Amino acid sequence: MKSKFFLIIFYILFIFNSNLFSNENSKTLRVGLLAPLSGPYSEIGNSLLYSLQLALEEIDDENVVIVPRDTGFNNEKKLTSAINDMRSSGVKVVIGPTTFEEFDQVKKYNDLIFISPSNMNPDFSNNIISIGVSLESQLLALTDFIKQQKKTKTIIMYPKNQYLEFIENKLSSLDLKNTSKFTYSPNPEVLTGEIEILTNYTQRKRSLELRKKMFEDKEDDQSIKELERLDQLYTLGGVNFDSVIIIDFGNNLKSVLTSLVYTDVNQDDVLFTTINQWFDESIFYENTIKNLYYPSVNYEEFKKYNNKYFEKFKIYPNEITILAYDALGLIYYAWKTNGQINSINDFSFKDKIKGKIGTFSFKNGKVTQDLDIYKTTNKKFVKF
C-alpha cells in the first residue's frame, strides 16, 4: 500500500510539472502549493496535493497548472527555497502556507499572493488571505443562532492555554452583546471545581437538602409526594445563564461538557454550543449531552468531497484539504473574472462566492463564511 501511495504522489507531481513545461504562455494560470511534502506532517501535505488534483479535474481547464513545492516542517530554509523556485516558475498566486506561524516569513514577498487555509486571521494581511473557518465567523453564526432561540444570558467559556490572549482579542473586537466570559483550567481535576463555582453548585445542593428536611417529618400525602419529587433531584434552583459557547475541542471539550452536566445544569433550560467541530463522530459517545449545537461547513458537500476523494485515492482526506480545494476554485474564479491576477485586491468581490465548504464573503478586506448550524443528536449530525 505504501509503494502505491508514493507511486500516486510521483504521478501527480509528474503531471503537475509536465503541464508546467507544456503550457509556457501568457494564458496559463500557475498556482503554487506550499505544503509539508516531507517530515512529520507529510501526510497533510500529500493530502493537499490530492485535493488539488480533484479540483483540477473539476475545473477541467488545461491552462491551470499547479506548482507544488515542499516546505518541510518549521523549516525556514526550505520555505524560502520553495518560494523562490515558484517565483522563477512564473507563479503569481500560492496556496499556503498552511500555518499562521509562517505568515511573517511570506509577507516579504510582495510580488506574490498567498491564499492560506489558516483560520487565525480573516483580515486581508498585506499579501495574505486566510480562508479557514475563522473564530469570528463561528462566533457570529452562534450568537445569531442563540438570539433566534431567544436566549439572553450567554457565557462564553474558553481555557487558560496558549490561545487565551488570541481568543480574548477576538472577543474584544467583536463586542458581542448579552455575553460574559469565563476562563477555566485545561486540567480536568481543577476544571470541575471551577465549574461548580460558575454554576453555584454547592449552594444549589445545600438548598435541596434544606428543602427536603422541611418535608422529612411530615406524613400528609402532599408532603410525601413533594419529598419523592425532591429525591429525584440533585440540586435545587437554576443557574444564572441560559446558553453557553464553549471555545474548545477534543477531550477538553468533553471534560467541560461532563462538568456542566455533573453540576446539574438543566439541558432543557440551557443551550449548549461549541465551535471547531469538523463532524467529529467521537462526540457521539459523550453520553452526558443530549443536544450540542455548533456552526460548521456544509455537511452534505463535506461528505460528497470525502467520498469522491476516497473513491480516487482509497484513503480519507485531512479536513484542511477541502479548504485547498476551495482555494483553487476561488483563484480560478478571480482569474477568469479579471482576466489576470495582479494584486490581493482582485479578491475583493462584491458578491458572495459559493464553495464546497459554504459561502464566502470578501468585503472590507475581510473573509467571512456563512456557516450552517448543526446539532448532534441520536448519533447523527442534523442541520438545524
How should these model regions be labeled?
Residues 3-13, 20-384:
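Extracytosolic ligand-binding ectodomains
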